[in-house]
Amino acid sequence: GTELEVKVTGVYLEGLKWMKFSHDALKAEPKKNDDGEIVPNVFLLKIAPDAPLGIHKAWIGGGKFGSSNYRSFVVGDLPEIEAGAGGASMEKPFEMEVGQTALGKAPAGKYGWFKFAAKKGQRILAEISTKDIDSKLMPSTALFDASGLQLDNDPQGGLLDFTATADGDFFVRLNDFLYKGGDDYV
């Protein structure tokens, strides 16, 4: 289980009072400041230890315009790290370890670069999960070795399946297929 703060953004959110989920193991309550006043559009989400892994749905409502449509999100068991837009170049990548989930958003007109180490014979699956969470990002990915040689790519799917042929550092390049980006490209 875990707890985290969720900030809801968008239009027509005046008077937002609740956040509900597709499973009872997920609960949220409005965040309050030190004076006990509700912080607008911010909720404290509690995920129970027995919450099922996978895709869940969230709704918000209680304001002037009733309930929202649902938005999907993932409950996972891998450590999560904030990657922002990834590294700006292969020379300055965002470094991560195999077995981590990177969270971030794609910048418009740019690549995000990620670096990881792998051992010879180690199979690596790098998946960019966007369709299941209603992201506008259409992932285009490519995998490179330390010399800059492209080893694999998936121009419109977001899945790289790779077995390292030698110990070393490897790089994933990510961008939107149409080079779009911003807050909705997560």
PLM feature spans:
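Short intrinsically disordered coil segments
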Residues: 60-61, 86-91, 155-158
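Acidic, Ser/Thr/Pro-rich low-complexity intrinsically disordered segments
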Residues: 2-31, 36-40, 49, 63, ...
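A short beta-strand micro-motif common to beta-rich folds, especially ectodomain repeats
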Residues: 51-62
